[in-house]
A protein has these predicted regions:
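Helix-loop-helix "hinge/cap" segment bordering the ligand-binding cleft or interdomain interface
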Residues: 115, 139-213, 230-275, 279, ...
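Loop/turn elements at helix/coil->beta-strand transitions in domains of secreted/extracellular proteins
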Residues: 33-36, 62-66, 87-91, 140-145, ...
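Ligand-binding "clamshell"
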Residues: 103-116, 143, 298-324
Length: 511
C-alpha cells in the first residue's frame, strides 16, 4: 500500500466502521457516537487533548469518541491496581502481564470472556496467532479474557564498542573463549586511552526482585544453552526449570570468575534498569546485551556519525557444546487489552481493537496521519520521513505504547529510533548479518496456574533465590551454599508447579 493512499483508505474505513455500528452506511455525529474509555500506560509527554490529531483520526475511522487515561509507565501498575479495585472500570484496559492479577480479575468477573466474540472481528483473527490467544486464557476459567497486543520478534545479541575492538585489534566475539579474551583486553589494555584501569566488558543491568540481575545477558547465556525462561527442553530433551538446566551453575560460575578477575563492572549489582546502555555511551563498558530493539534504542541516543563508526550489533555467542548460534523465540506479545465485563460499549471497544489490527488501523496508530505526523513512508524499506515539526507532533501525540498492535502479519510499520537513512541502512544490514548466522527456533509460552499462584504467594522464596545468585557471583557465598538452597529449599517448593509447567510445555509443543 502506498503512503498517499492512507488517508483515503482511512476515510473508507470510517464509513465501514459506521456500517458495522448499525448506522445504515451513515456515520454518526460525534454526539451520537459511543464513547470508549481507555486505560493505558503512555509516556508523559504524550497529550491526549482535543487537539490530538492522531486520536481524532482514529475516532473518525472507527466512529467512536475516545476518553484516554494514561498514567506514565513508572506508576502504571499502582494506578492499575487502584482502577481494577474501584468498581468503575474503563472499557479497554492495558494489561502488561497475564499473571496472577490477570487470572484473579478474570475469575472475579471483571474481564469480559471473549471466546464467543472473536469470530465476529476478522482482523483480530487474521493478525493475532493462536499461540497468542492461548496466552490470554485465564488459567482459573479457561476462557480468553483479553486481546493480545502483537509485538515485533526480539533478536537477542549484543552491541559492542567497535572503536574499542579496533583499538585492541580484535574481532567481535563469537565464542565464550573469544569473549573472555575480549573481557581481559578491555580491563587491562586501556581501550579508551585515558590511562586509567576503569573499563570493563560488561555491567549487567537487567532487573528482578533483588535489583540488578545476571539473567539479562542473553548473548552470554547462549554459550551455556540457557535462556531466562525455561520454555524449551534441556539438552536431555526434558522440560525443567532453569535451575535444573545443565548450564545453570556453570554460567553463574563463569560470571563469578569474571567478577573475581575484575573483568566486569564491580558495582553492577547496584545498577538501575537500562544503566548498562548509558555506560556504553559513556565509554565505561565495551558491550551490552540486548535484542535488536536495544540496538535501535542505542542508535536513537547516539548521533548518526557515532552509530556508523562506534557501535555494531552482533549475534549471541555459539553454544559451547554444539557450536551452533541459536535463539529461542516465544510468541511476540507485548501485553494485552482487557475489556471490562460491565462495559456498555464492549462491541465498540472490540471494533476499535479490530480496526487497530487491520492494515489501515495498524499504520494509523503506529505512524500517524500523512502530512501531519510524517512526510513520506516506504513500506518496503520501512523508511519513515518526518520534518522536525512532524517529529515533534508525533512525540506529543503518539507513542510506542499507543498502538493496539505493533505489528501487522508479524512486521513492524517502521524501524523506531533509526531516524536517519544512514542509521536505518546500518540497522538493516546488521540485522541481515545476524539472521544469516543465527538459527531461530520457535518455542511456546504457557501459563501454569500453579506457578502463577506460587509466585504470588511466595515472593520471599524467589527474592532469596535472586539474592543468593548475586551473592554467589560476587563471592559472598560458596557454590555449595547456593546448591544447598536451590536443591533443598527452592526446588522442593516449586516442584509441583515445575511439573505442571513441563506438562503444559510438552502439550503445547506436540500441537
Amino acid at each position: 500500500m502506498k503512503p498517499k493512499q492512507l488517508l483515503s483508505m482511512l476515510a473508507c474505513a470510517a464509513l465501514a466502521a459506521g456500517t458495522l455500528a448499525g448506522c445504515g452506511g451513515d456515520t454518526q455525529t460525534t454526539e451520537e457516537r459511543p464513547t470508549v474509555r481507555i486505560f493505558n500506560r503512555v509516556n508523559a509527554e504524550v497529550q491526549f487533548d482535543k487537539n490530538n490529531e492522531a486520536v481524532k483520526a482514529l475516532e473518525d475511522a472507527v466512529n467512536v469518541n475516545l476518553e484516554i487515561e494514561a498514567p506514565p509507565p513508572s506508576s502504571y501498575n499502582d494506578k492499575l491496581q487502584i482502577t481494577m479495585a474501584s468498581g468503575d472500570l474503563p472499557d479497554i484496559i492495558y494489561l502488561f502481564q497475564t499473571d496472577n492479577n490477570f487470572d484473579t480479575w478474570a475469575k472475579n468477573g471483571l474481564l469480559l470472556p471473549l471466546d464467543d466474540k472473536i469470530d465476529q472481528y476478522p482482523n483480530l483473527k487474521d493478525n493475532i496467532s493462536d499461540e497468542m490467544w492461548a496466552l490470554t486464557k485465564a488459567p482459573s476459567t479457561g476462557q480468553i479474557s483479553a486481546v493480545p497486543k502483537s509485538n515485533t520478534t526480539s533478536h537477542w545479541g549484543y552491541v559492542v564498542n567497535q572503536k574499542w575492538l579496533d583499538a585492541l585489534g580484535m574481532e567481535p566475539p563469537t565464542t565464550l573463549d573469544e569473549f573472555y579474551e575480549f573481557a581481559k583486553a578491555v580491563a587491562t589494555q586501556d581501550p579508551d586511552g585515558n590511562g586509567a584501569a576503569d573499563t570493563f566488558a560488561l555491567s549487567p543491568s537487567a532487573q528482578n526482585t533483588a535489583g540488578a540481575s545476571v539473567w539479562g545477558e542473553y548473548f552470554l547465556m547462549s554459550a551455556f544453552n540457557l535462556q531466562q525462561y525455561a520454555n524449551r527442553s534441556d539438552v536431555d530433551g526434558q522440560y525443567k526449570p532453569k535451575e535444573q538446566f545443565e548450564g545453570y551453575y556453570p554460567y553463574l560460575t563463569f560470571l563469578r570468575q569474571l567478577y573475581e578477575e575484575k573483568l566486569i563492572d564491580p558495582e553492577f549489582f547496584i545498577n538501575k534498569d537500562g544503566e548498562s546502555s548509558e555506560k556504553l555511551l559513556q565509554n565505561r563498558v565495551g558491550m551490552i546485551s540486548g535484542h535488536d530493539g536495544a540496538a535501535k534504542g542505542l542508535f536513537g541516543k547516539a548521533s548518526t556519525e557515532q552509530v556508523i563508526s562506534d557501535y555494531c550489533y552482533y549475534p549471541p555467542l555459539a553454544d559451547n557444546d554444539t557450536g551452533e548460534v541459536v535463539q529461542y523465540i516465544p510468541p511476540a506479545m507485548w501485553g494485552c487489552w482487557g475489556i471490562a465485563a460491565n462495559s456498555k460499549v464492549a462491541d465498540a471497544a472490540l471494533r476499535l481493537l479490530d480496526y487497530g489490527n487491520s492494515e489501515e488501523g495498524w499504520l494509523l496508530t503506529n505512524i500517524g496521519v500523512q502530512g501531519v505526523h510524517y512526510e513520506s513512508y516506504d513500506p518496503a524499506t520501512k523508511e519513515l520521513i518526518r520534518t522536525d515539526v512532524q517529529s515533534e507532533k508525533s512525540r506529543s501525540e503518539m507513542s510506542a505504547y499507543t498502538p493496539f498492535s505493533v505489528t501487522y502479519h508479524g512486521e513492524p510499520a517502521y524501524i523506531s529510533l533509526c531516524d536517519t537513512t544512514e542509521k536505518l541502512q546500518k540497522y538493516n544490514s546488521e540485522l541481515e548479518r545476524y539472521l544469516s548466522v543465527t538459527k531461530e527456533v520457535s518455542v511456546p509460552t504457557v501459563n501454569s496456574p500453579k506457578y502463577i499462584a506460587l509466585n504470588a504467594n511466595n515472593p520471599d522464596l524467589f527474592k532469596k533465590r535472586d539474592q543468593m545468585e548475586i551473592q554467589y557471583v560476587t563471592g559472598e557465598i560458596t557454590l555449595e551454599e547456593l546448591q544447598d538452597f536451590i536443591e533443598n529449599e527452592f526446588l522442593p517448593k516449586t516442584a509441583e508447579a515445575d511439573q505442571e509447567t513441563a506438562e503444559l510445555l510438552r502439550a503445547a509443543t506436540e500441537q
